[in-house]
Amino acid sequence: RERGSGATRKFSFSTPAIIEVNGSTQVISPGTDVVHALDLKDGSVIWQASYDGYSVIPRPVFGHGMVYMSTGYGTPNVLAIALDGKGDVTNTHLRWRLQKGAPHTPSLLLVKDELYMVSDRGIATCVDARTGAIHWQQRVGAAYSASPIYASGRVYLLSEEGVGTVLAASTEFKSLAVNDLQERSLASYGVAGDSLVIRTAKHLFWVEEE
């Protein structure tokens, strides 16, 4: 069938990922209805894959010979696409797809063999990055815009309500801490050495261990 979301607003906001594949530098750029892998030297298309989606926001991540991305609005899907293709790889290089728990806004987080994500509606998910098999899914709040980050064996989440949740980076769900900043936040954590920088609506917090 003909693919495409039918979106009339052909824009996206995803920051491209720049990766090395077999000695060449590829720019992975998701957009409305299609992701392109471009040659950094001349901008030529190395490969492309189509999907239904527009206004793509999450930044793609790279590992295990695949790029992982979310397709944006309307119904987001997380796609794992092998990087060794040429031309249109839509029907040949898609290794797995996940719809339940896929984010519209927060970017994905790859830690070793696991891919972590949190949906805009507050569902956190951990999957096997190689196969897409779900290790766990758990509600961790109501709404999210900020992307998860990893530090010191932990995954850090921050909801729009300003509630920070700390999870173990594990194939088993383990909530280690919950901290309510009592102020709205849409920004992802910043990391500076062993410290976290947190932006809320009215404050900038610097958090470090005593």
Predicted regions and their residues:
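Extracytoplasmic beta-rich repeat domains
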Residues: 1-24, 30, 48-63, 70-76, ...
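Short loop/turn segments immediately following the C-termini of beta-strands
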Residues: 30-32, 72-74, 83, 120, ...
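Membrane-embedded hairpin module used as a gating/binding unit in multi-pass transport
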Residues: 34-40
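Blade-level signature of beta-propeller repeat domains, shared across WD40, Kelch, NHL, RCC1
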Residues: 76, 162-163, 169, 183-210
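Short loop/turn segments immediately following beta-strands, especially the blade-tip
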Residues: 80-89, 129-130, 166-172, 208-210
